[in-house]
């Protein structure tokens, strides 16, 4: 249930709980939370067991399509093509992506800095400032 929660997140939750509840009420809150989670887990496993008892062999008939749907949920278009059309041979995708890797490398490399020729850039000649009566 909390498989994606790491130690860092648990530490943050503990510190927030310590600040919000205080050191006196925090152990009781942790105890209540663990008991509640245990009750929910027992209730869910009990519901599964009671369904299995009531449905009998039909439970497996219901469970098989759900397991197939679960497998399909994780399928990406690339995985579907590899499995069904290419019989698991993934080398076609490697040959297609190899030229793209060269393009990515060329795009991500910084462009060389242009060399500026100082002889081409001449300052303006001193003299009177030009005045355009139509522009003002």
From Swiss-Prot:
| HAMAP family, per database record | TatB (MF_00237)
Q: Which UniProt keywords apply?
A: Cell membrane, Membrane, Protein transport, Translocation, Transmembrane, Transmembrane helix, Transport
UniProt xrefs under NCBIfam families: tatB
**Protein task:** Part of the twin-arginine translocation (Tat) system that transports large folded proteins containing a characteristic twin-arginine motif in their signal peptide across membranes. Together with TatC, TatB is part of a receptor directly interacting with Tat signal peptides. TatB may form an oligomeric binding site that transiently accommodates folded Tat precursor proteins before their translocation.
Q: Name one GO cellular component term.
A: TAT protein transport complex
Protein name in the entry:
Sec-independent protein translocase protein TatB
Q: Provide the primary localization.
A: membrane
- Which residue ranges run through the membrane? 2-22
Checking InterPro entries in the record gives:
TatA/B/E, TatB
């Amino acid at each position: 249930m909390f498989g994606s929660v790491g130690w860092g997140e648990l530490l943050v939750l503990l510190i927030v709980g310590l600040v919000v509840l205080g050191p006196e009420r925090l152990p009781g809150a942790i105890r209540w939370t663990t008991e509640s989670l245990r009750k929910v887990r027992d209730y869910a496993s009990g519901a599964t067991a009671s369904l299995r008892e009531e449905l009998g062999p039909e439970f497996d008939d219901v469970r098989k399509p759900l397991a197939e749907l679960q497998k399909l949920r994780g399928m990406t278009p690339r995985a579907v093509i590899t499995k069904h059309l290419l019989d698991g041979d993934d080398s076609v995708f490697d040959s297609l992506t190899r030229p793209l890797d060269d393009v990515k490398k060329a795009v991500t490399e910084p462009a060389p800095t242009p060399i500026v020729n100082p002889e081409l850039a001449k300052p303006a000649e001193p003299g009177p400032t030009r005045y355009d009566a139509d522009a003002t």
